[in-house]
From Swiss-Prot:
The keyword Nucleotide-binding applies. The gene is DED81. This is Asparagine--tRNA ligase, cytoplasmic. Its EC number is 6.1.1.22. Keywords: Aminoacyl-tRNA synthetase, ATP-binding, Cytoplasm, Ligase, Nucleotide-binding, Protein biosynthesis. Belongs to the class-II aminoacyl-tRNA synthetase family. The lineage of its organism: Eukaryota, Fungi, Dikarya, Ascomycota, Saccharomycotina. PANTHER family: ASPARAGINE--TRNA LIGASE, CYTOPLASMIC, ASPARTYL/LYSYL-TRNA SYNTHETASE. It comes from Saccharomyces cerevisiae (strain ATCC 204508 / S288c) (Baker's yeast).
Length: 554
C-alpha cells in the first residue's frame, strides 16, 4: 500500500504531483482522485500535515470518509469535462465541415428567371408576384437554422428579406454584417395573415451582390453607437446615429413638415424669398450676434430675416422665408440651438386678429398635412402615439391675465415672489401654466419693456404691444410674432430707446417713408415644432447636425 502526503498550505492538486513529503497534494480528495487516475488498485494511506504538531499524521476516519466523497465528485466532474470536450471537438469538426461546404457554395444568378425590375423599397410593396432588385443597407440581421432574415433599408422604407437554401449556407452570407450594402434579387410575396412586416410583404431572395461589407468585431456599427452611450459620444458619431430608427424618422417628419408649411403658404398666396445670412444690422439684440470680419468691415450672421422680409411687402406682397438663423447664446437648455431653421413670414394690410388667425391656420393645416402624409403620418404615430392635432380656435390669453393666473395658482417668479405686471414670464412658469391648461394658447399683449423695439403698441393700452407667443402643452413656446410699428416717428423713438444707431437701417426706415402700411409677422423654430410633433426631449434631436455652445462638429 502506497502513502500519499497532503499539506494544505503548500500542496498542489495536479495529476503530476508526486504526493511525497517534499511534493505533497493540497487536499485529501484530490490525492485519492489522482491515485485512481493512475490505476492504483489499492487505496493509498493518506498523511495530513498538522501545523500545530509540525508533522505529518495519518488522516482520521471522518476526514477519509469526506475525502472519498470529494473524490467521487471529482471523478464525475472529470467525466463531464471529457464529454464536453468531445462535444466541443465534434462541434468544431461540424463547423469546419460547414465552413468548407460554405466556401464551396458559389452564389450565381439563375439566368432562367425573369429579369429583375430595379425598384426602391417603398415602391416594391406594390409589386407582389414580381421579381425585383433592391439595393440598400442591412438594418437588421438574424439567422434561424437554415434561413437568414435581413431587414433592408434604403431611405424610402424597410423590407424584410429571406435567404434560404444555399444562399443561407454560403460563407459570403455568413460574413454579412449590419450596415453592409447589398443588392438583393428576388420575388415580392404577400405575408400570410397573422404575420407582420413593413409594407405587408417580404422579399424571397434568389440572388444577391455585396456592394460594401461593413466591419464586424470591435469596429462594428453597434459598438460605435451602443445603446446608452454618453450623448456627447453619440453626437460625435451623428453620421452613424442618423441611421437609427428614431432619428431617421424625425428627419423624415421634418421634411414633410417643411413641405406642408410651404403648401399652406402657397394656399395663402405668400411668396418665398431668400434674404441674406450675412448682415450688418441686428434684430434681437447685440449680445447674441455671431460677429465676423467681412472684407475689413464688421458683419454678423443673421438672427432673423424679419427686416428684409418687411422690405419685400411693397413689391411682392405677403412673403416668407425658410432658412437658418443664428444666435450666439451660451445656453445649454434642451430648447436652444445656436443654428436653427427659421420659418418667418411678414404680411401687409392686416389687423392683429388677422395675424393670429393666419398663424392658427398655418399651424393647424401644416400639422394636418403632415399627419395625412403616407410616410410622415405613421412615423408621427410611432414616435408620439398620444399626439393630438391642434384645433382652431386656440385659447386667447392676455399677458395681464396670465400674471393673475400664475399668482392664483401659487406659481412664483425666478426670485420666488409673486408675479407683477412687467415681469418676464420665465420658461419654467410658462411651461407649468401651459401644461396645466392643456390646450394651445395665444399668449398676447406683452408689456413694451420686455418685447423688441419694433413691436406696435396697442391703441387701447399703450403699456402693451400687439404681440403673441404660441404655447403648446408639454413643449412651451413654438412661435413668436407681432404687429410691427408702421409710424416712422414711433419707430425712430424705438431705435433711440434701445440706443441703436439708425444709419445702418436707412433701408428699413424707408419702408415707413415711401408708403407705410399696417403689417405684422412671426418666426417659428422648426426644431421646436418638430420636438412637439415627434415627442422629443430636446430640439437637438430635431436638427440634422445640431449646433450649440461647445458643439460645432462633425
Amino acid at each position: 500500500m502506497s502513502s500519499l502526503y497532503i499539506k494544505e498550505a503548500t500542496g498542489v492538486d495536479e495529476l503530476t504531483t508526486a504526493g511525497s513529503q517534499d511534493h505533497p497534494f493540497k487536499t485529501p480528495a484530490y490525492a485519492l482522485f489522482a491515485s485512481q487516475q493512475k490505476s492504483d488498485a489499492t487505496e493509498p494511506k493518506l498523511f495530513v500535515f498538522k501545523t500545530e504538531d509540525n508533522e505529518y499524521q495519518e488522516i482520521s476516519a471522518s476526514a477519509l470518509k469526506k475525502a472519498r466523497k470529494g473524490c467521487d465528485g471529482l471523478k464525475k466532474k472529470a467525466v463531464k469535462q471529457k464529454e464536453q470536450e468531445l462535444k466541443k471537438q465534434q462541434k468544431e469538426a461540424e463547423n469546419a465541415a460547414k465552413q468548407l461546404s460554405a466556401l464551396n457554395i458559389t452564389i450565381k444568378e439563375d439566368e432562367s428567371l425573369p429579369a429583375a425590375i430595379k425598384t426602391r423599397i417603398y415602391d416594391s410593396y406594390s409589386k407582389v408576384g414580381q421579381r425585383v432588385k433592391v439595393s440598400g443597407w442591412i438594418h437588421r440581421l438574424r439567422s434561424n437554422k437554415k434561413v437568414i432574415f435581413v431587414v433592408l433599408r434604403d431611405g424610402s422604407g424597410f423590407i424584410q428579406c429571406v435567404l434560404s437554401g444555399d444562399l443561407a449556407l454560403a460563407q459570403q452570407t455568413l460574413d454579412l454584417t449590419l450596415e453592409s450594402t447589398v443588392t438583393l434579387y428576388g420575388t415580392i410575396v404577400k405575408l400570410p395573415e397573422g404575420k407582420t412586416a413593413p409594407g405587408g410583404v417580404e422579399l424571397n431572395v434568389d440572388y444577391y451582390e455585396v456592394v460594401g461589407l461593413a466591419p464586424g468585431g470591435e469596429d462594428s456599427f453597434t459598438n460605435k453607437i451602443a445603446e446608452g452611450s454618453d450623448p456627447s459620444l453619440l453626437l460625435d458619431q451623428r453620421h452613424l446615429a442618423l441611421r437609427g430608427d428614431a432619428l431617421s424618422a424625425v428627419m423624415k417628419v421634418r421634411a414633410a413638415l417643411l413641405k406642408s408649411v410651404r403648401r399652406v403658404y402657397d394656399e395663402e398666396h405668400l411668396t418665398e424669398v431668400t434674404p441674406p445670412c450675412m448682415v450688418q444690422t441686428q434684430v434681437e439684440g447685440g449680445s447674441t450676434l455671431f460677429k465676423m470680419n467681412y472684407y475689413g468691415e464688421e458683419a454678423y450672421l443673421t438672427q432673423s430675416s424679419q427686416l428684409y422680409l418687411e422690405t419685400c411687402l411693397a413689391s411682392l406682397g405677403d412673403v416668407y422665408t425658410i432658412q437658418e438663423s443664428f444666435r450666439a447664446e451660451k445656453s445649454h437648455t434642451r430648447r436652444h440651438l445656436s443654428e436653427y431653421t427659421h420659418i418667418e413670414a411678414e404680411l401687409a394690410f392686416l389687423t392683429f386678429d388677422d395675424l393670429l388667425q393666419h398663424i392658427e391656420t398655418l399651424i393647424v393645416k401644416s400639422v394636418q398635412y403632415v399627419l395625412e402624409d403616407p410616410i410622415a403620418g405613421p412615423l408621427v404615430k410611432q414616435l408620439n402615439p398620444n399626439f393630438k392635432a391642434p384645433k382652431a380656435p386656440f385659447m386667447r390669453l392676455q399677458y395681464k391675465d396670465a400674471i393673475t393666473w400664475l399668482n392664483e395658482h401659487d406659481i412664483k417668479n425666478e426670485e420666488g415672489e409673486d408675479f407683477k405686471f412687467g415681469d418676464d414670464i420665465a420658461e419654467a412658469a410658462e411651461r407649468k401654466m401651459t401644461d396645466t391648461i392643456g390646450v394651445p394658447i395665444f399668449l398676447t399683449r406683452f408689456p413694451v419693456e420686455i418685447k423688441s423695439f419694433y413691436m406696435k403698441r396697442c391703441s387701447d393700452d399703450p403699456r402693451v404691444t400687439e404681440s403673441v407667443d404660441v404655447l403648446m402643452p408639454n413643449v412651451g413656446e413654438i412661435t413668436g410674432g407681432s404687429m410691427r410699428i408702421d409710424d416712422m416717428d414711433e419707430l425712430m423713438a424705438g431705435f433711440k430707446r434701445e440706443g441703436i444707431d439708425t444709419d445702418a437701417y436707412y433701408w428699413f426706415i424707408d419702408q415707413r417713408k415711401y408708403g407705410t402700411c399696417p403689417h405684422g409677422g412671426y418666426g417659428i423654430g422648426t426644431e421646436r415644432i418638430l420636438a412637439w410633433l415627434c415627442d422629443r426631449f430636446t430640439v437637438r434631436d430635431c436638427s440634422l447636425y445640431p449646433r450649440f455652445s461647445g458643439r460645432c462638429k462633425p
